[in-house]
């Protein structure tokens, strides 16, 4: 394969559905989605087997590192209200118990399997705070854990038995028992097992505070040495008890028609509320009690503080923030609860240099520009940082290299953060451009999500180096140290993404020749992976295609206002907004579907006094939807459920019990009209089930029938009704069928049947002429849709389902289809059209020779008119436009139409027509259907000449691009060809090909690695680079097989090697290399030659790649050595002869640091 043009044409004939690029969080999202579905089914039927299977899958994926099991458990709490109350037959506790006590999945490292989940907590905390806790043990808790699991299992079993879903005898082949109604005796058994489980948990819970104490100690309390471990375990036990209470209440109320002890249930509800309050207070006070003192100007203090807060937040506070939603009284059991958490957690400071944390730290707030100094706020206190309401898209780090006075300086000195609506550039200053030894540049663009950032550094008399790495070791700038003095240890945080990176400088230096203020370190702030700045309601259930029943809570921190202050509230999962008297908070909310909502607010007041609030909603058309004041009594004056926060008692109150919000942008205004400060936690939107009945039209007048008959006939070009009229659109056909359906069955039954048959024929003809496949997004369509795009049913402006492109918050939002060249005719004009019910920031692109159509459509929200028998459509009640807008004559028309001309056919590259619709801004969305691309007419001579000029221009650019790609690929192609015999990529590699030849091959990054329109999908050049990578993978496999040394390239760490002294893997230029730290460090391996034939001589070649000092290799009964003493990576080869079947390989440092990239021992059988 010697010519890149052999490869090149293949990428033009790509599928219409380019592969979607994976996100770092996709495995978690998919696992949680499957669990959610399994829980929904289990909650409705009580049938356990499918749920157990998905729990097993979740556990397995956590064991291989694909997902974080603790994060999955934490996220599962949100499922507690998922099953509608009328359908639920089992409570959520029956699922949650198996999360906490994964007895199905084997045993932990302790003898008691019930401790397995808590061992996971210990391991995760160790990772988060980089401590060992070597003396900590769970031994004193084992009996308590066993008792809790036993009692909860009894409760589980009694619930299952009550609904006829208990264990069944054998020989019942393929039978799934049907859930039944419990008897009174069964419900009494469930109540008693609930009491037993509650008592067992509450007896054990105090001992979670300090498991190191004897079980006879009746007053255990948290200890500063172990609180990082014990508070998360206490939180887990408390969560079990709260969910047990919630589940029992839910179960008892579900079957209240059988037996219902109202006084006991009411008392249990009170107990649940009190426990939420008590447990929350315990978590809050404990967190504050042991929180380290922060000195923002000292790196060691900053790191100690950050480790404590992030561990407590991720393992305890985040969970405690969900506890109020377990209150059956205030949170409905028939909605999915989704609460945004805007709290920030911070990484350790990485850099400016590593090896000593007791240095000054100048934290630079890159979000706060100023006109002095380096241009941003310096000496910042991270405790004052808040969620900035922006979403990080990508980042770049700047690095510079300077050789000054025999000292090599190479490090990062700036960064660029790219957000959806702005770019922040910081640093990159004080560069001496006149110094020819000064080199500087930005590193590669790193796209979000980004999970971690680290710095590795080396400081000596002649070297001042650091390298910056992200996402587990990907180098992004700087120089890799030859011998590391230290490296930061920031790990990826479970289900968290980086949103801001703050720069850090230090006036201290590790060595007198090192730079200070120019060298930057970094500290990252992390937020939940699914948090976005936008507030979106009106989600669609993809199964029912109807609005989902959701409770969405948006922190007030996501709003804005003049001079608003933010105050810390760790228990809320967000900072609270402090509104002084008559201050106003504003928040934008995007509603995707018109429906009714209950709107609530969670707040506290100064001194827990009464609250006075003015609540105002401005709808999409600028009209007031509600504009009124509310007075709420103080917490003490009524029996209100509250949780104590740092600034008062947080309570819920209803702002409006039921209000219909139209689809589109809503502006929410909340004003404090009291003299006392108001602390806003969040605003909640609860979607309400629809109670309205669709109005139907019923035509009984002969005049109506005559009008509709005429409209049906006008769909066709002739009385034969075999061809559509040229001007008839697909949407017009749908409008006519709505009128036909409105004819009375009783009066016009025969005529209606005949007319419907004709309209069906018209629809089929419309589909046949449409070169798009699935213009109505019906089954079998060939659209490439973004992952959140969904079909919606029952919209009055559409016949059948339509496509909703949601706001592109977490993921892009688009619909795309490519028309194959074989479907097109030469020298022909095509019409592109469709109907939009509503859109904001909808981008429409039609491309053949280069984006012939590129438009932005904003179609206002308008309601449907009643179906009429005349020719007017049912769009729309006048709002911003009149009904005439539907005919395409108005600038904001619901119906769009464009033309695109096709010249000569380009079948060799399958040029085709590309048609895409996407949402351009995060708060946009669109409702679309009836999309068409149909043949219009042949081109005129003048039009043919015009399109020929376009073709020539396109062809020239195409050929130039092909030549540039071929030039870019040729060096890599030559390298890969050299690896293989006869340049056959499917054949055998040359005997001389080794790891070094492989590592020298760099697959180039081509310009179209990503799709030009569909963000997040592969582009056409990926096909080329994949073929290169596959050839390299095949070569690697063959080289690996011929190497007698096991794991000679260190791809599997130190597996198969015997290690002595300080030998460890490190990253050098993004590759793993072995570092022998001192002369007492070595690795060795013994190899036995298979099928060795006596004294037959075998020639072996040994290839090493290393840096600095010396190497010695030992062969059994005979010593052979290879010596290395260079300051750069060097490869050496040597041939040895021996007659035995056993070889000992020994790699030894003879001085200081010795770096090894790979070791090879290859048989060469002499003829």
UniProtKB/Swiss-Prot annotation:
Gene Ontology terms describing biological process: sporulation resulting in formation of a cellular spore; symbiont-mediated killing of host cell
Effect of residue 237 to A: In strain: PS178D4
Disulfide bonds: none
Keyword annotations of the record: Sporulation, Toxin, Virulence
Effect caused by changing residue 477 to A: In strain: PS178D4
A molecular function GO annotation: toxin activity
Stored Pfam families: Cry1Ac_D5, Endotoxin_C, Endotoxin_N
InterPro entries xref list: Cry_V (IPR041587), Galactose-bd-like_sf (IPR008979), Pest_crys_dom-III (IPR005638), Pest_crys_dom_I (IPR005639), Pest_crys_N_sf (IPR036716)
Recorded family membership: Belongs to the delta endotoxin family.
Note: Toxic segment of the protein is located in the N-terminus.
Function statement: Endotoxin with nematicidal activity.
Annotated protein name in UniProt: Pesticidal crystal protein Cry21Aa
Organism, scientific name: Bacillus thuringiensis
């Amino acid at each position: 394969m010697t010519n890149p043009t052999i490869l090149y044409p293949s990428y033009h004939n790509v599928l219409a559905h380019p592969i979607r690029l994976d996100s770092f969080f996709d495995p978690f999202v998919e696992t949680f989605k499957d669990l959610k579905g399994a829980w929904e089914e289990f909650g409705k039927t009580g049938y356990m087997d499918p749920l157990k299977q998905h729990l097993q899958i979740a556990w397995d994926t956590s064991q291989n590192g694909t997902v974080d099991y603790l994060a999955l458990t934490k996220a599962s709490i949100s499922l507690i209200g998922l099953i509608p109350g009328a359908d639920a037959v089992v409570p959520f506790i029956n699922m949650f118990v198996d999360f906490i006590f994964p007895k199905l999945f084997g045993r932990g490292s302790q003898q008691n399997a019930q401790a397995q989940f808590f061992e996971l907590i210990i391991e995760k905390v160790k990772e988060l705070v980089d401590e060992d806790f070597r003396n900590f043990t769970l031994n004193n808790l084992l009996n308590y854990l066993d008792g809790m699991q036993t009692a909860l299992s009894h409760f589980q079993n009694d619930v299952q038995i009550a609904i006829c879903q208990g264990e069944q005898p054998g020989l019942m082949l393929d039978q799934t028992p049907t859930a039944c109604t419990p008897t009174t005796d069964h419900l009494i058994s469930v109540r008693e097992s609930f009491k037993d489980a509650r008592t067992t948990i509450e007896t054990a819970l105090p001992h979670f505070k300090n498991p190191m104490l004897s079980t006879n100690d009746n007053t255990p309390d948290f200890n500063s040495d172990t609180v990082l471990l014990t508070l998360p375990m206490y939180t887990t036990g408390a969560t079990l008890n709260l969910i047990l209470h919630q589940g029992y209440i839910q179960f008892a109320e579900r079957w209240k028609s059988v037996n219902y002890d109202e006084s006991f249930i009411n008392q249990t509800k009170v107990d649940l509320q009190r426990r939420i309050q008590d447990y929350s207070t315990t978590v809050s006070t404990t967190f504050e009690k042991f929180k380290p003192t922060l000195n923002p100007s000292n790196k060691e203090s900053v790191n100690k503080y950050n480790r404590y807060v992030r561990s407590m937040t991720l393992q305890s506070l985040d969970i405690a923030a969900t506890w109020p939603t377990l209150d059956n009284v205030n949170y409905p059991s028939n909605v999915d609860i989704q609460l945004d958490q805007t709290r920030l957690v911070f990484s350790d400071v990485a850099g400016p240099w590593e090896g000593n944390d007791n240095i000054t730290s100048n934290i630079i707030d890159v979000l706060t520009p100023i006109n002095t100094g380096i241009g941003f706020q310096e000496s910042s206190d991270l405790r004052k940082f808040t969620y900035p309401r922006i979403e990080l898209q990508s980042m770049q780090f700047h690095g510079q290299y300077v050789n000054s006075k025999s000292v090599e300086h190479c490090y990062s000195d700036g960064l660029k953060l790219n957000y959806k609506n702005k770019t922040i550039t910081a640093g990159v200053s004080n560069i001496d451009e006149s110094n020819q030894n000064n080199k500087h540049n930005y590193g590669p663009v790193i796209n979000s999500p980004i999970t971690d950032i680290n710095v590795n550094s080396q400081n000596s008399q002649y070297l001042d180096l650091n390298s910056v790495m992200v996402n587990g070791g990907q180098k992004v700038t700087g120089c890799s140290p030859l011998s590391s003095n230290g490296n930061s240890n920031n790990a990826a945080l479970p289900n968290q993404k980086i949103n801001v990176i703050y720069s850090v400088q230090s006036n201290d230096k590790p060595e007198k020749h090192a730079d200070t203020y120019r060298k930057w370190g970094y500290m990252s702030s992390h937020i939940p992976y699914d948090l976005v700045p936008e507030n979106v309601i009106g989600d669609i259930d993809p199964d029912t295609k109807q609005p989902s029943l959701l409770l969405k809570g948006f922190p007030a921190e996501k709003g804005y206002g003049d001079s608003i202050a933010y105050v810390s509230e760790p228990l809320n999962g967000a900072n609270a907004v402090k509104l002084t008297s008559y201050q106003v908070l504003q928040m934008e909310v995007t509603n995707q579907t018109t429906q009714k909502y209950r709107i609530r607010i969670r707040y506290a007041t100064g001194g827990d006094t009464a609250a006075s609030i003015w609540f105002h909603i401005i709808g999409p058309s600028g009209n007031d939807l509600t504009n009124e004041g509310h007075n709420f009594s103080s917490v003490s004056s009524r029996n209100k459920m509250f949780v104590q926060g740092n600034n008062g008692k947080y309570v819920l109150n209803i702002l409006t019990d039921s209000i219909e919000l139209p689809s589109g942008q809503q502006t929410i205004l909340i004003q404090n009209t009291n003299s006392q400060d108001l602390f806003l936690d969040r605003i909640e939107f609860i979607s309400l089930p629809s109670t309205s009945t669709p109005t139907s039209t019923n035509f009984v007048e002969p005049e109506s029938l005559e009008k509709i008959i005429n409209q049906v006939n006008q769909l066709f070009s002739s009385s034969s009704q075999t061809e559509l009229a040229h001007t008839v659109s697909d949407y017009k056909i749908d409008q006519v069928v709505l009128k036909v359906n409105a004819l009375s069955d009783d009066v016009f039954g025969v005529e209606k049947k005949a007319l419907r048959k004709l309209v069906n024929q018209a629809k089929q003809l419309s589909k046949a002429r449409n070169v798009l496949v699935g213009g109505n997004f019906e089954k079998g369509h060939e659209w490439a849709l973004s992952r959140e795009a969904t079909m919606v049913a029952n919209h009055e402006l559409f016949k059948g389902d339509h496509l909703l492109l949601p706001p592109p918050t977490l993921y892009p939002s688009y619909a795309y289809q490519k028309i194959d060249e074989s479907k097109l005719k030469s020298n022909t004009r095509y019409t592109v059209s469709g109907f939009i019910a509503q859109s904001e920031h909808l981008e429409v692109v039609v491309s053949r020779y280069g984006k012939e159509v590129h438009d932005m459509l904003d179609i206002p929200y308008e309601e449907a008119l009643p179906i009429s028998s005349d020719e007017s459509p049912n769009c729309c009640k006048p709002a911003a436009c009149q009904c005439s807008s539907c005919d395409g004559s108005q600038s904001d028309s619901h119906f769009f139409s464009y033309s695109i001309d096709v010249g000569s056919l380009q079948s060799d590259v399958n040029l085709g027509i590309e048609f895409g619709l996407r949402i351009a801004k995060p708060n946009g969305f669109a409702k679309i259907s009836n999309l068409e691309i149909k043949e219009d007419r042949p081109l005129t001579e003048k039009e043919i000449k015009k399109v020929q000029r376009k073709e020539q221009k396109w062809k020239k650019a195409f050929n130039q691009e092909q030549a540039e790609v071929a030039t870019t690929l040729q060096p890599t192609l030559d390298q890969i060809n050299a690896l293989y015999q006869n340049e056959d990529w499917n054949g055998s590699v040359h005997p001389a090909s080794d790891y070094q030849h492989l590592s020298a091959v760099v697959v180039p990054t081509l310009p179209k690695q990503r799709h030009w329109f569909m963000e997040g999908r592969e582009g056409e050049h990926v096909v080329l680079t994949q073929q290169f990578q596959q050839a390299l993978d095949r070569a690697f496999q063959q080289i690996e097989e011929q190497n007698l040394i096991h794991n000679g390239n260190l791809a599997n760490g130190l597996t198969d090697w015997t290690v002595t002294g300080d030998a460890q893997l490190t990253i050098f230029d993004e590759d793993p290399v072995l570092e022998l730290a001192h002369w007492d460090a070595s690795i060795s391996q013994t190899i036995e030659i298979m099928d060795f034939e006596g004294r037959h001589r075998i020639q072996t070649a040994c290839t090493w790649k290393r840096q600095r000092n010396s190497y010695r290799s030992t062969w059994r009964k005979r010593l052979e050595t290879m010596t290395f003493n260079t300051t750069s990576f060097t490869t050496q080869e040597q041939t040895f002869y021996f007659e035995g079947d056993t070889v000992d390989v020994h790699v030894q440092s003879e001085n200081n640091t010795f770096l090894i990239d790979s070791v090879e021992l290859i048989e060469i059988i002499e003829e």
